[in-house]
Amino acid sequence: MLFGRLTERAQRVLAHAQEEAIRLNHSNIGTEHLLLGLMKEPEGIAAKVLESFNITEDKVIEEVEKLIGHGQDHVGTLHYTPRAKKVIELSMDEARKLHHNFVGTEHILLGLIRENEGVAARVFANLDLNITKARAQVVKALGNPEMSNKNAQASKSNNTPTLDSLARDLTVIAKDGTLDPVIGRDKEITRVIEVLSRRTKNNPVLIGEPGVGKTAIAEGLAQAIVNNEVPETLKDKRVMSLDMGTVVAGTKYRGEFEERLKKVMEEIQQAGNVILFIDELHTLVGAGGAEGAIDASNILKPALARGELQCIGATTLDEYRKNIEKDAALERRFQPVQVDEPSVVDTVAILKGLRDRYEAHHRINISDEAIEAAVKLSNRYVSDRFLPDKAIDLIDEASSKVRLKSHTTPNNLKEIEQEIEKVKNEKDAAVHAQEFENAANLRDKQTKLEKQYEEAKNEWKNAQNGMSTSLSEEDIAEVIAGWTGIPLTKINETESEKLLSLEDTLHERVIGQKDAVNSISKAVRRARAGLKDPKRPIGSFIFLGPTGVGKTELARALAESMFGDDDAMIRVDMSEFMEKHAVSRLVGAPLGYVGHDDGGQLTEKVRRKPYSVILFDEIEKAHPDVFNILLQVLDDGHLTDTKGRTVDFRNTIIIMTSNVGAQELQDQRFAGFGGSSDGQDYETIRKTMLKELKNSFRPEFLNRVDDIIVFHKLTKEELKEIVTMMVNKLTNRLSEQNINIIVTDKAKDKIAEEGYDPEYGARPLIRAIQKTIEDNLSELILDGNQIEGKKVTVDHDGKEFKYDIAEQTSETKTPSQA
């Protein structure tokens, strides 16, 4: 707040406000304390105006104490509430409108009148202050009819009418104090001033990534001119922001655009004190240049070269390269000023400078911790945008969320409102039916409810005023989690239990394979607890083993446990990348090839879902060169697509599956199943597969993988468990047709026996179930047997499968229990 612009009496009002907050043991200085401060200055215009409406200091004190009362003992620094800050800003705005250089008590009173939601506004309402008359009385006391000189600013610029209609005067806006403060850009503003002070080609162009603060530098220059912090050469200059879209708009006939632009140039040259600011400078190229007519850039070139027209441009690096650099004559008329992305420390300082504006707008308190969290989290997790823009957006949206949450009408008030409406309708119906005694009772009930509603509403409002709404780190984390889908909020008890029991959750779908399940679970817990390396993926794994042991199933189970759906993972079938040129499909087709605009199959999916499980299935099937592209993904957690965009893989789990070495094992008659010495078999499988893996893939690729896991062979007991899982899936499908199927243990053992194949793992079980159960059931259904609503028991008598169809009884188990 600009305390230097306050009169001595207004400064004393703020001091009195602080004293009143201390006297009442309040933790913040609010609008009510400002009002009490005004009453403590009886010689001020504000106090005299209020006294003329029979509002005295004693009455104000009584109302304030009645509305919010005394607080608990408070120790610590007092801060202004967002509403109080808003009042100070409004008072400064009132002073500007009345063309006063300083803010007095009268302006603070006008600010309190305009801010109509605080405790002070309720005090005015309770004391029956006529707001319109009070405002008129203040203006009358000043002897200065409001806005009598409405066009005072326009008189300075009446020699540039066309320019004024097409451009915004940033110096006037800066004088009004409505521009956001510019922090930490002194070096760039100084360089702009140096270029503007040249004799010729005095046209700086601000070049930088979107959102780094290029436009803010032009606004900073306007503020520097207003504050008289510029050299003599730039004093009294006007910075005018010209929008090329506005210049082109409405030019229906040929020559109209050129005439309008020439008129603007003539006015600028005659005025001699205008610096033109063109945001999105690349729009000059081609603007208005249809059917052979010259465009805006060619019209401006002569004046820019001679120094008759001072222009500040702003554009991005890509647009500068595409549009400005290709026109060498235009490029040499502008002097580039590089605007880099600010550091994390500088961004924190920028946000602290903007804090007052956002607190006043959202009427909440923004803590230092929230600002630091916004900068750090946006810098880490929002990789396709730039500071400070993304951090400012994060603070703005989180503040909006907190404000809306705290100002939502509570349920008890809504219930009373609905009850009042209901009673009112019943009363009207009773009157219409001429049941006047009942109507009178309902009227009394309505009055009682309305009184109850007012009391509850006042209690809620008092609680709101007493409670300072603050923006916390957790609010910031919630918003960024909503943006990216990455869970960043504090781990609650339910999620903590879920993470600690992740192994059990995965084992519900994946039978056996403890090593793989444990390794994956540990990686997920490390990431969620915030302990993982921030520059690498959550985890990268190679799953080795013969076919059908659960490698792909584990990836699906992990996706389901993390996202609630096993289709949520990004699956890349490497058998589709058997040719060398197919690698372009991962990151996008090169420039000039068909499909360049479509993006890569992998990069586009990860850009849309940065928090995901990526499965590269059957990696040995792909061309060896395909894996070179994954080197930087595994090491640095990012990949650059063909459009030059960096795609962030730091919040992904990368799983690669392979059957490499399986053929050699088969040749050695070790397929990974059966055998009496399980440990010996597993060691043989492990050594063979790791040896083949090293022969098939380069060491720099394998060295970047977090863990290489060789899956165990499946025992007969595990196969029986898998049969039970598959049968349960079948019963769930049949339950949709109202058929209850029960498969006995003997039948399951026989299915496991028939489906047991040492070469193919668990997949033959699917075929065994189809052959033994599904085929026969389908015949029963199609043969006219009415088995819908009945119980079908599948058993094996030692020779063949038997099917017993019976009516369902109340004791019959549900399909899920079968």
From Swiss-Prot:
Q: Which family does it belong to?
A: Belongs to the ClpA/ClpB family. ClpC subfamily.
Q: Where is this region: Repeat 1?
A: 6-71
SUPFAM superfamilies associated with the record:
Double Clp-N motif, P-loop containing nucleoside triphosphate hydrolases
Region listing for I, in residue ranges: 163-410
The task this protein performs is described as:
Required for growth at high temperatures, probably by acting as a chaperone during heat shock and targeting heat-denatured proteins for degradation by ClpP.
Q: Which domain of life is it from?
A: Bacteria
Q: Which organism is it from?
A: Staphylococcus aureus (strain MW2)
What are the protein's GO molecular function terms?
ATP binding; ATP hydrolysis activity
One GO CC term of this entry? cytoplasm
- Location of the UVR domain: 417-452
Q: Indicate what this protein is called per its UniProt record.
A: ATP-dependent Clp protease ATP-binding subunit ClpC
Q: Where is this region: Repeat 2?
A: 80-144
Per UniProt, residues of the Clp R domain are: 3-144
Which Pfam families does this one have?
A: AAA, AAA_2, AAA_lid_9, Clp_N, ClpB_D2-small
Isomerase keyword on record = no
Q: CDD domains attached here?
A: AAA, RecA-like_ClpB_Hsp104-like
Q: Which UniProt keywords apply?
A: ATP-binding, Chaperone, Nucleotide-binding, Repeat, Stress response
Which positions in this protein are listed as binding ATP? 208-215, 545-552
What are its GO biological-process terms? Answer: cellular response to heat
- II as annotated region, ranges: 471-662
